[in-house]
Amino acid sequence: MASSKNMPSRITQKSMEPPLRETWQQVVQEMVMRKQRDEEEKQNLVTGKEKSWVSIDLLGTKQEGKRQKVNIWGPWEKWGIKIVWVMLWVIQLMLWGCLIWEMGKKHSCNAEEVIALVDDPGGFQKVKYVESVPVTCMTKNFTQWGCQPEGAYPDPDLEYRNISQDILEQVYKQEWPWNTYHWPLWQMENMRQWMKENEKEYTSRNNKTKEDIDALLAGKIRGRFCVPYPFALLKCEEWCWYPANINQETGHAQQIKINCTKAKAVSCTEQMPLAAVQRVYWEKEDEEGMKFMNIQACNESQLRCKTSPGGCVQGYPIPVGAEIIPESMKYLRGKKSPYGGIKDKNGELKLPLSVRVWVRMANLSGWVNGTPPYWSARIKGSTGINGTRWYGIGTLHHLGYNISSNPEKGLCNFTKELWIGGDRFQYQYKPSWNCSQNWTGYPVWHVFRYLDMTEHMTSRCVQRPLRHNITVGNGTITGNCSVTDWEGCNCTRSGNYLYNSTTGGLLVIICRQNSTITGIMGTNTNWTTMWGIYKNCSECKNSTLDRTDNGTLGTVNNINCSLPHYNESNKWTCAARNSKKKRDSLYIAGRDFWGRVKALYSCESNLGGLDGMMHQQMVLQKYQVIKVRAYTYGVVDMPKAYREKNMRNKRSTEISRPRKKRGIGLVIVLAIMAIIAAAGAGLGVANAVQQSYTRTAVQSLANATAAQQNVLEATYAMVQHVAKGVRILEARVARVEAIVDRMMLYHELDCWHYQHYCVTSTRTEVAQYVNWTRYKDNCTWQQWEEEIEQHEANLSLLLKEAALQVQIAQRDAQRIPDVWKALQEAFDWSGWFSWLKYIPWIVVCIVGVICFRLLMCVITMCLQAYRQVREIRYTRVTVVIEAPVDLEEKQREERDGSSGSENLEHEKRTSPRSFIQIWRATVQAWKTSPWGKGWKKILYMTLLPLLTLQIWMEETGWNGDKRCKKKKERVDCQDRESMPAIENEYVELS
């Protein structure tokens, strides 16, 4: 029973009763829940957490679960998530935009613009002073002539480089200049020296002597002139001429410029004779080169001469001011010019040319029997025709022979002379060529001068009109006429007419063939001024300049009242000078309207007359010396990482030294100065450049390819330009060498290679005086030179700024501050110690006063001793000549009226002492005096000879009897009792 009571009852509550029937799904769910509770309990035991809290509601039901806490930040978290989400989208859009913007840029890497030297195959620099360019010749006979063998330089016909027309125009600006090349002058000097050295040997020769020298004299030895790298020759292949600087008063062209439109760069010239004497006919191999010198007028210039009957002038214009033989080789000039029209105003070659000279290959098609056209129609004995004066018509000098100007005659006469420049040498030789041959077809030089220099208006030379043949047209001239516009002017009758210009001056219009205007001369002087001068001429008040029908061209009524001019005394006159029934022929010139002109022709011409030197000089004018530049300046983008890496690697190899970090202001100024100096950089290599050429660069140069050599050459040139800038600063700033050393030591000027560029550390933003960005990616050397020329005016400003930067850099670079200078700047001590400059004068004055006092002391002591010794002498003399008894008796006798014969006898008994006696007495007196003792003894001993001499002279009477008498009277009148007692007076009396 008891056991049965203790057992639980099977009867439970309805809720606790198991379901009668459970589904499978309920069973699985219950098992899962139990499993989860077990795992949760295990996890709590492991982590040490307490068991979930238990709550009992009012019905007594247990509720297990976690406590639900209230979150007060819930709303904020909800909106914060949204804000963060929006910000992330904004950042994402910004990143996408930056990415798209960077992709749109040319360079996506982080870089900075730096100045660099880039490859420029067509770059070159013109050389203004060709005297400094090295040159050599190349020929087959190189051993005899001292030249290089053929093949030493590239053949210009096979190896050359074309130059674009844009670069030509940019560099030379449509002006191909004249150059006086020194190479032909050297050849001429060698020939002249060789002839002078062998001048004595030539006297033994005859005309049968034949040797190889005739080939040299005749110009058979041909060769080329070549220049070494980096120099080259720019050969013009197409050119034309055009006028420039037209004078608005006279109408003449002050300059004729040459425009080269096609050229190529070569190393050597064409074949030409290396040396030759004066000749007329040249070889047919030279015809092509001579014909090229017949330059025609440019088509774009629209010159008036193109529509004139004679056309425009053809030839090469040697400009006004050209110097044929420079001053350094003046010994080659000679007395007179041997080249015909190529001469100065005095007919020599000492001065530059005063008139433009044209040289061309002669066109002899219209010549008849060796004379120019219409030569037979000239006035008999005249040397000119159609306004041109001809020289050398008839006979010409050709290689030592007088040859006819008619090439078909073949007349030759040997002159036994060779003309080389202005010198003539006697020489006998038998040429291997035939002088008497038919020279038709051989090229000849034609030299002519247009004295009025109006080639752009007409090519016809006119005979200048006489002044009395200039008249007023009176309706003959119509239209608008001026010296620069001939097209609007018309004439109806041949003559020389005075006409008003449309510009306000006066014109002389030359009309021929009743309708053709062949020349117009002008001046700014108007009609009113001219007429006032005309009326002031004597006998011309009632005269006019109207035309009379005397002559074909007409003349004035009174020939003594012609157009005014300046006479030989530089005074106005209207009449020509008369002398012995002869009258001066006065003409009017285009460039000298009021002058006294006596030249009839406006042109001068001659055939031949040129030697090998002038032939080479003319042919070489188609060449210009240039300096090849295989690089140019540009702006490139250098990655900063690459730059920093190279700088770090390079500096790690050097010895690190502690220094104060400074700015790059000095480097900037030096770089700018180097840039400014680049256009005029010298041809030599500076020592600084050689030192900066490191061992690594030399090894790289030895192993480099062609492209790398260009890069290294650019590097070399950049450093050379910097060195040139340093040399410029050296002349203006002190101690630049130390600054350059500091630059090199601190690597403030570096150069490295990046994508075939030589890049410096100078950034573009610091180059304030050069617009680098203008030439980015397409900068050429020519553009660089043009940019440099525009900034040369800032050179003084740059030098001042450079000097300031140098001073600042020197101040910052000092390790120990200069305390003295700092104090001097803080306190102006300049006026405090200004009196110190007088200290030397004060010292000199003090020393001078001391010396003067010492001298006066010595002199005073000497004078005092002299007086005392002299007083002793007088005392002794007084005792010697004293006779007390006799004096009293004599006085008494004289009072009694005696004649004084006793006195005379007594005077006869006393005789003057000798010099030795006086010397002894003086020495004895000196010994007994205080001056003969102590340190003064030697000093005053020097006075004894002088004192003895003076006493002896007084004794002998040389100083006069008057003094002796006075002494005697003074002694005789003395009282005996007043005289002192002397110890040795009896010694003297005996």
From Swiss-Prot:
Residues covered by region (Fusion peptide): 663-683
Lipid addition sites, S-palmitoyl cysteine: C862
Glycosylation sites: 141, 162, 207, 259, 299, 363, 386, 402, 413, 434, 438, 469, 474, 480, 490, 500, 514, 526, 536, 542, 550, 560, 567, 703, 771, 778, 794
Transmembrane stretches, start-end: 839-859
Annotated positions for site Cleavage: R662, G663
Region (Disordered): 890-909
GO cellular component annotations of the record: host cell plasma membrane; membrane; viral envelope; virion membrane
Post-translational modification: Specific enzymatic cleavages in vivo yield mature proteins. Envelope glycoproteins are synthesized as an inactive precursor that is N-glycosylated and processed likely by host cell furin or by a furin-like protease in the Golgi to yield the mature SU and TM proteins. The cleavage site between SU and TM requires the minimal sequence [KR]-X-[KR]-R.
Cytoplasmic topological segments: 860-990
KW Iron (keyword) present: no
Domain of life assignment: Viruses
SUPFAM superfamilies from the UniProt entry: Virus ectodomain
Region called Immunosuppression, residue ranges: 729-745
N-terminal signal peptide: 1-107
Extracellular side: 108-838
Keywords: Cleavage on pair of basic residues, Coiled coil, Disulfide bond, Glycoprotein, Host cell membrane, Host membrane, Host-virus interaction, Lipoprotein, Membrane, Palmitate, Signal, Transmembrane, Transmembrane helix, Viral attachment to host cell, Viral envelope protein, Virion, Virus entry into host cell
Coiled coil: 695-745, 786-821
Biological processes per GO annotation: symbiont entry into host cell; virion attachment to host cell
UniProt function note: The surface protein (SU) attaches the virus to the host cell by binding to its receptor. This interaction triggers the refolding of the transmembrane protein (TM) and is thought to activate its fusogenic potential by unmasking its fusion peptide. Fusion occurs at the host cell plasma membrane. The transmembrane protein (TM) acts as a class I viral fusion protein. Under the current model, the protein has at least 3 conformational states: pre-fusion native state, pre-hairpin intermediate state, and post-fusion hairpin state. During viral and target cell membrane fusion, the coiled coil regions (heptad repeats) assume a trimer-of-hairpins structure, positioning the fusion peptide in close proximity to the C-terminal region of the ectodomain. The formation of this structure appears to drive apposition and subsequent fusion of viral and target cell membranes.
Subunit-structure text: The mature envelope protein (Env) consists of a trimer of SU-TM heterodimers attached by noncovalent interactions or by a labile interchain disulfide bond.
Protein name per its UniProtKB record: Envelope glycoprotein gp160
Species, as recorded: Ovine maedi visna related virus (strain South Africa)
Lineage: Viruses, Riboviria, Pararnavirae, Artverviricota, Revtraviricetes
